[in-house]
Amino acid sequence: MSHPRSALLISPPIYDTQYWAHWSMPYGLLRVASWLKTKGYVLKLIDCLEANRTRTVPKRMRKVRKVCSIQEYKPPSWSAFRPKEDERIEYCFGMTPEDLEKRLKQIQAKARSAQRSLFDERVFPEPDEIWISSIMTYWWESTRDVIEVCRRVFPKAVIRVGGIYPTLAPEHAIDKLGLRNPLHLQGRELDPLDPKQQRRDLVVSATIPGANPLPLDLDLYREDGAGEPEEHAELPNYTILTTSRGCPFKCAYCSANVLNEGRKVWVREYASAYEEVKHRFNQGIREFCFYEDNLLLGKTNFLELIRKIADDSDLRGIELHAPEGIEVRLLHADVAKLMRRAGFKRLYLPLETINAKMQKDWQRTHTNMDKFFYALDNAVEAGYKLRCQDINCFILFGLPDEDLQAVYDTVVFASSRVGSVIPMLFTPVPSTPMFELYRDYIEEKGFDFQHLNGKLLPFLDYNRQRYRRLSVRDYLTLEGLMWRLNTKVRNSSFNIGGSNRVEQAFRRVLTAT
């Protein structure tokens, strides 16, 4: 008797100095799960970053990293440890590899017990395949560690790694992850029923066309792997929607063209997305978060979707979010009004900089301050309020060759004109023009991807060519300024007497003036 092919799906933990888990979900992996089910697979999910009902995940100290350096170490004791100004504590957010190994061994023991008493279709078997999603390139180490754990517990299973990291840097993934004789495929070449592919570890780049239009298989969060509900298991209280993929522009720091194999924009049929919203709303989910490369490029389709949501009285109480940002030139008055009516309580606008030269250097030719003001005026006309968290602006800093005065000018402008400022430290992304432009510096420093995390200020030394006395404290002061200005629009206050690095740096600036 032949049995259906089984796959264990794993979303790894992450190693970082900070992590915001509010709308964290392995939506690519969950869409692939829906696709695999159409192929007859039996599935089980382990989301190492599964957030609790307060949208937080556990964290454990892992090591100390020095800013703009490859130096790292573990202190003899964490209890009395205090990092220096140029050091950052790196945490493991989510389920640790050690805890994951215990979980896998439980699955193994249960499967073997069921096998001894004849095959039980209600028990998830030892997996034929293990599918692992890998997101940011600078988080690649946790993917490696998850693979190592899986190898120890399920040595016969073949492994598939997909996501942003293996798409942007497949050679790095092949070289570093410890895969066995891996085959590199584009998503469009993937055939899970091909016997040759079934025998090989795979590195999968780009998207799987057959999975793109499918809904997320959230039911895996409450199933034991064989379609049976787990005791006390619940669906997440939010979900992710993707109604389009791709972007026709090619900003110097952005990888969307590589992730989507070109500039073509794929749009999901709005009726399908609407049915998904209805289904999940009826299951009790109220928050829906759009993750798109450029939300309003498929504007006609998107507007049809949110118009149906706005007009559906059964969806009263829904909350919609677009935290990736909205293209300012496309935020027309009617669009802003419809978004507000449908349930978008907040807008996120990619201001990034008010400096025209920097916009040009970043190849952001499709936006400028006139278009930003256009979007801002339309948002206000639609009922969004300024100088509160209704409208939020992203500000990009920590870039090579940046003009620090322009960053300060942008912060002051955004705070006074808009209100809520969201600081974004720059991380160079492999395969982008900006990464290639500064590749010599990156290689000279000996940086691997984990050292390029923006929170580690990888271009601090580079920018000292322009600002000789530039220090970590200057960036802490800049962050402190943003948090201080944000206190007028947020419920929480900035503790000027506090003990964290940002608060200390800001206090030093005040006492020096």
Annotated model-derived regions:
Residues 2-283:
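Acidic, low-complexity intrinsically disordered segments
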Residues 8-15, 24, 390, 404-513:
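C-terminal accessory regions of radical SAM enzymes
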Residues 165, 293-297, 325, 398, ...:
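Short, solvent-exposed turn/loop segments enriched in Gly/Ser/Thr/Pro and often Arg
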Residues 223-386, 397, 412:
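Radical SAM [4Fe-4S] cluster-binding motif and immediate context
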Residues 179, 340-346, 416-420:
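Glycine-enriched alpha-helix->loop->beta-strand junction motifs that scaffold or abut catalytic
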Residues 38-43, 153-154, 282-283, 312, ...:
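A structural motif corresponding to the C-terminal end of an alpha-helix
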Residues 7, 159, 288, 320, ...:
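Hydrophobic/aromatic residues located in beta-strands of well-ordered beta-sheets
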Residues 170-175, 334-335, 400-415:
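Catalytic cores of alpha/beta
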